[in-house]
Amino acid sequence: MSHFSRCFDECSKIERPNVNKKLTRLIIVLFCLLCIIVTLGVIGYKFLFKMSYVDAIYNTAITTSTLGIAPGDKTDAEKIFTGIYAVLVGVFFISVISAIVSYMFTTYILD
């Protein structure tokens, strides 16, 4: 048996139970944060601007997905809320992407 084969066999036996637990925990936390952000958007549109739930969900989906389609005329307050909400959603998604990439890089590439 060559040196390479023995080394490969030993390396393949290494288990990483903590990696899977950490990744699962990270995904659960990020999913919960996403649910909170979407819920805050729906609540904001529903109660601040007296929209129906369908319109509130629609506006939240448009803002969250960064489509930016502006349905109808909006008041200044709606524009301000949508702008602030869009910035928060953007920061959230950038944070999520950087956290996942950083975690995967340090876990799988540096080890």
Curated annotation (Swiss-Prot):
Gene3D superfamilies from the UniProt entry: 1.10.287.70
Topology in membrane: Multi-pass membrane protein
Keyword Transcription regulation: no
Source organism superkingdom: Viruses
Major place of residence: membrane
InterPro entries: K_chnl_dom (IPR013099)
Subcellular location field: Membrane
Presence of the UniProt keyword Protein biosynthesis in the record: no
GO cellular component terms listed in the entry, alphabetical order: membrane
Membrane-spanning residues: 27-47, 80-100
Keywords recorded for this protein, A-Z: Membrane, Transmembrane, Transmembrane helix
Protein name, as recorded: Uncharacterized protein R694
Organism lineage string: Viruses, Varidnaviria, Bamfordvirae, Nucleocytoviricota, Megaviricetes
